Amino acid sequence: MSHDSDDKTFPYQKDDAELRRRLTPMQYEVTQHAATERAFTGEYTDTEDAGIYKCVVCSTPLFESGAKFHSGCGWPSYFKPLNGEVIDEKIDYSHGMVRVEVRCNHCGAHLGHVFEDGPRDKTGLRYCINSAALNFESRPENE
């Protein structure tokens, strides 16, 4: 699934040649062609450090470490984004399923999917995000 067929225009317009130079092949395939990294292989699956997870394409802050939880699914999971403005959601009919795709609302990079099986005492949502779509910026707990 390529985002080229999507009608939505995002504020950050990325140059494909520049992205191919700057991103790893996995980062490029995940963010630009909605690929999925293999479960339990991502850099941030088990990260517990305090900080902010940002879009690997445009550096938009997306998730705080305080919203991260261990879901056991094999990908970093969060019960909410940093705020309601940073995420774009789109129905995804690929692979014979109906899911909700999660994209960066600034550049349109594919991040992962959101499911309704997250912590019930929080939002009930599980944002299942590819590590390859993220960069982590460590921050002290008290910031």
From Swiss-Prot:
It catalyses: L-methionyl-[protein] + [thioredoxin]-disulfide + H2O = L-methionyl-(R)-S-oxide-[protein] + [thioredoxin]-dithiol. Its cofactor is Zn(2+). GO terms for molecular function: peptide-methionine (R)-S-oxide reductase activity; zinc ion binding. It is an enzyme of class 1 (oxidoreductase). Keywords: Metal-binding, Oxidoreductase, Zinc. GO terms for biological process: protein repair; response to oxidative stress. InterPro entries: Met_Sox_Rdtase_MsrB, Met_Sox_Rdtase_MsrB_dom, Mss4-like_sf. The active site is at 128 (nucleophile). SUPFAM superfamilies: Mss4-like. Residues 16-139 form the MsrB domain. HAMAP family: MsrB (MF_01400). This is Peptide methionine sulfoxide reductase MsrB. It comes from Burkholderia cenocepacia (strain ATCC BAA-245 / DSM 16553 / LMG 16656 / NCTC 13227 / J2315 / CF5610). The gene is msrB.
